[in-house]
Design a protein with these regions (language model features):
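A Rossmann-like FAD-binding core segment of flavoenzymes
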Residues: 73, 108-111, 115-127, 194-292
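N-terminal Rossmann-like FAD-binding beta1-loop-alpha1 element of flavoenzymes
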Residues: 5-30, 185-192
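Beta1/beta-strand and adjacent pyrophosphate-binding region of the FAD-binding site
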Residues: 1-14, 171-181
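Short hydrophobic core segments
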Residues: 7-9, 114, 133-143, 178, ...
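Glycine-rich dinucleotide-binding loop and its adjacent helix/turn
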Residues: 46, 142-196, 201, 229-230, ...
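FAD-site-proximal beta/loop scaffold in flavoenzymes
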Residues: 155-171, 255-330
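Structured beta-strand/loop patches that form or line metal/cofactor-binding pockets in enzymes
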Residues: 352-375
Length: 375
């Protein structure tokens, strides 16, 4: 049995930053990650989508160059295989950077799936492969997984999630995106700029439900001018090889023929097979319950990142990991706060927010002022 001060399960933004932080504060750290270091953000989310988006935005700027006094001659042709290859190179470079950071910090990295397996006195046991590790503290940072909704026929078609969309080396002939949140709308922008016909189906009255309603509506209209078709307050009732069957808000049913379906209805905390039951760690709808110091119902087990279900953003995860390590080492009183977390949709144009939206303040009956600056 190997001994460490802290075991961190998960090598995403919460995990790897917390590992380096803990090591710099004198703790002996072991980090477990069964796939690539960097988590969803680096491998299947923030970084690859923004890399593709940069190519798409650059293409838009070239097309608009004449308005800025620049003549571009000849055909303007995106080569998606080359765009995807650049994306892969960026991800590989940054993943290597995470490994280098952890090695430099003296963190022991184990490429295995790990789970909680019990206690011995004041030590927590973590099992990975054939090995068991004895530690004083654990930080759970296993992230989240894509929600697959129970849509009839879904198991009989070759649908994509963001993972498959990012792994593709060719563009789809057309795409129907189920879900109008940040991930879905970012893909809508990428595909429309690259010439792919796009539909977006959203159950809510507006896209980007967590953002300011007026801003979201303005973005939807801009994307509409670019050819993206939106179906709001619309439910997907079935999918097949022929396409997507929808039910509109007035009860009408319609088949939308499509070549590719992209599911983007959200993510859920990844807690399965983690062994939470061995230490009676409390959960709420699969999210690990924590206090303001990221401490779970077990005093020596902490959690950070998407697994807590609060704010599925990389910078939130990093801060949560920081709060957890600070509490473990007995640092200054510095609890986690969620009232001023910035969020961004990397659309074209980008939109961002911080704090409560106007809709939230209105629903809570709180006083607020709105200021608008035409640009």
């Amino acid at each position: 049995m190997k001994n460490f001060d802290i075991a961190i399960i998960g090598g995403g933004p919460a995990g790897y930053n917390a590992a380096a932080n803990a090591s710099s504060n004198g703790l002996q750290v072991v980090l477990f990650e069964h796939t690539a270091l960097g988590g969803v953000c680096l491998n299947e989310g923030c970084i690859p989508t923004k890399t593709l988006l940069h190519s798409a935005n650059l293409l838009d700027e070239i097309r608009e160059a004449k308005a800025f006094g620049i003549e571009v001659e000849g055909a303007i042709t995106p080569h998606y295989a080359a765009i995807a290859a650049r994306k892969d190179k960026v991800v590989q470079t940054l993943t290597s950077g995470v490994a280098y950071k952890l090695k430099g910090a003296g963190v022991t990295v184990i490429q295995e799936t790990a789970r909680l397996s019990g206690e011995e006195g004041d030590r927590i046991l973590v099992t990975a492969g054939e090995e068991t590790y004895s530690v004083s503290f654990v930080l759970l940072a296993t992230g989240s997984s894509t929600i697959i909704p129970p849509i009839p026929g879904l198991d009989k078609v070759n649908y994509w999630t963001s993972r498959e969309a990012l792994a593709a080396k060719t563009l789809p002939e057309d795409v129907t995106i189920i879900g109008g949140g940040v991930i879905g709308i970012e893909f809508a922008g990428i595909y429309s700029s690259l010439g792919v016909p796009v539909r977006v189906i959203e159950m809510a009255p507006e896209i980007l439900g967590a953002m300011d309603r007026e801003t979201s509506a303005m973005l939807r209209k801009e994307y509409g001018r670019r050819g993206v078709k939106f179906y709001l307050e619309t439910k997907v009732t079935a999918v097949s090889e022929e396409g997507v069957t929808i039910e509109t808000k007035d009860g009408k049913s319609e088949l939308l023929p499509t070549r590719q379906i992209l599911l983007s209805v959200g993510r859920r905390p990844e807690t399965e097979a983690l062994g939470l039951e061995t230490l009676s760690i409390a959960t709420n709808r699969s999210a690990v319950v924590v206090n303001a110091y990221m401490q779970t119902s077990h005093p020596r087990v902490y959690a950070a990142g998407d697994i807590t279900g609060f704010s599925l953003l990389a910078h939130t995860a990093i801060r949560e990991g920081e709060v957890a390590i600070n509490h473990i080492i007995g640092g200054e009183d510095d609890p986690m706060r969620y009232d001023a977390i910035p969020s961004v949709a990397y659309t074209h144009p980008e939109i961002a927010g911080v704090g409560a939206t106007e809709e939230q303040l209105r629903s809570e009956g709180r006083y607020y002022r709105t200021l608008k600056l035409p640009m």
